[in-house]
Regions:
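Conserved Lys-Pro-Asp/Glu-containing loop-to-beta segment of HAD-superfamily phosphomonoesterases
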Residues: 330-368
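Substrate-recognition element of Asp-dependent hydrolases with the DxDx(T/V) motif
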Residues: 260, 264-300, 311-324
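Active-site neighborhood of HAD-like aspartate-dependent phosphohydrolases
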Residues: 230-274
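Conserved N-terminal catalytic core of the sugar/cofactor nucleotidyltransferase
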Residues: 2-5, 13, 27, 31-107, ...
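Acidic, Mg2+-coordinating phosphoryl-transfer loop and its flanking beta/alpha structural elements
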Residues: 362-394
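Short beta-strand-to-loop element that shapes/binds the nucleotide-sugar donor at the catalytic cleft/hinge
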Residues: 124-141
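Catalytic-core segments of class I nucleotidyltransferases/pyrophosphorylases
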Residues: 99-100, 107, 113-117, 130-133, ...
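N-terminal nucleotide-binding beta1-loop-alpha1 segment
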Residues: 1-19, 232-238
Length: 395
């Protein structure tokens, strides 16, 4: 498998440390970050077909690194700098039909074999929960992991904390019909998702974007011998998150429970993945449409973002209800399904889509039916809330 390692930036946010060297040649424990990155590639035999794209100021650092190595990469030195996307368009003639693209300012320790085998041969990007969304490109993706929307790092309000990690699996033809110009890779993806399927591979493995002094300092304090598993919360909606006295079919009826807001605020310091799994039988009964549900959830997230600078990362919805006799009911949803709680298929899907560690998941709901699917999927921490999130029972 060919790997394109992109190191074209000047690292201005890390000056003066990067005045004459690329970011990945900064040292941690007397070892360059590139040394760690290269070791990870070797572990999965991804070092043999390596292309390094850099600029003329930094080229010699890579030449020196590989002087005594058996496998020599192709080093492309370019000036002027075209941006992460423009550089790929300019050099696509050197790429194989399928390849992995990695940004040089990402410290990573991931299972590349698992990533490559996910959605075999399809365009995909490793995504993760970011704690610095203000300077990250963030995304929405659907239950099939297809990326549906990208929020540019320049956008002020973002309704997602899931960001692009800087590691891609791409087919060369994604650059077809693109003219050479200065452009970021995220903007190319933004254009392509309109008519091309690009998948998100969510990983709970740790990624560090060390592109600022503050984040570089944090990276230096970390231990690298273990991959950290991130916390995840699966939260029920009605009766746990919002009041369920009246059927919620309009934004006017959304009323957050005070104890939920108190609890949700505490989550911010842990930066966990937050998933909402909710039964919405009103869709099958004809009380509300999928489109209206999505509008409600967008509004709900907007309110959380404004109040707490935090939001739900993804909503999983079961629209089914088998009992018939409702005026305006939708026949295709009048079935016995495997996703309506207490059934567990949406929990399994969330587990699969996000590569979760069940020991690190907290499942929270106000009914026993919310607890059962957690237990079925081996979640260790199932919390039944009794009116308030402060008084709860761990099952």
């Amino acid at each position: 498998m060919q790997v394109i390692f992109q190191s074209g930036g000047l690292g201005t946010r890390l000056y003066p440390e990067t005045l004459n060297k690329p970011k990945c040649f900064l040292k941690i424990n007397n070892k360059t970050i590139f040394n760690y990155q290269y070791s990870e590639l070797k572990k999965y035999n991804l070092h043999k077909k390596l292309i390094i794209i850099t600029n003329k100021k930094h080229e010699q650092h890579f030449i020196n690194f590989f002087k005594k190595k058996h496998n020599k990469p192709k080093i492309i030195s370019e000036d002027p700098i075209w941006g992460s996307g423009g550089s790929m368009i300019k050099n696509k003639k050197f790429f194989q039909k399928k390849f992995i693209l990695i940004y040089s300012d990402i410290f990573f320790k991931i299972n590349f074999k698992k990533f490559i085998n996910f959605k075999k041969d399809k365009n995909k990007i490793i995504c993760h929960k970011s704690n610095h969304v203000f300077d990250s490109d963030t995304i929405f993706f659907d239950k099939n992991n297809r990326i549906t929307k990208i929020f540019s790092k320049k956008e002020k309000i973002k309704l997602s904390n899931i960001s692009l990690s800087g590691i891609y699996f791409l087919n060369k033809n994604i650059f077809n019909k693109l003219r050479l110009k200065k452009i970021d890779m995220a903007n190319i993806i933004k254009k392509k998702i309109k008519n091309k399927v690009i998948y998100s591979y969510y990983s709970s493995e740790e990624f560090f974007d060390f592109g600022t002094k503050k984040r570089l300092l944090k990276l230096k304090k970390e231990k690298f011998n273990k991959i950290k598993k991130k916390l995840a919360f699966i939260i029920d909606r009605d009766g746990t998150m919002i009041d369920e006295k009246n059927y919620v079919n309009s934004i006017r009826k959304i009323k957050f429970l005070k104890d939920f807001l108190f609890f949700f605020k505490q989550l911010k310091k842990f930066n966990p993945l937050i998933i909402c799994i909710t039964n919405q039988s009103g869709i099958s009964k004809g009380f509300i449409t999928y489109k209206q549900i999505h509008k409600l959830h967008k509004f709900l997230n907007l309110k959380l973002q404004k109040k707490l600078k935090l939001n739900i990362d993804v909503f999983y919805i079961c629209p089914h209800f088998p009992e018939k006799g409702f005026k305006g009911e939708v026949k295709k949803y009048k079935i016995k399904c495997s996703c309506r709680k207490p059934q567990s298929s949406l929990f399994k899907l969330a587990n699969k889509n996000y590569n979760l560690n069940t020991a690190k998941i907290y499942n929270i709901g106000n009914n026993i039916s919310d607890m059962v699917p957690g237990i079925k999927t081996n979640i260790k921490n199932n919390i039944l809330v009794n009116r308030t999130l402060k008084n709860n029972i761990i099952i």
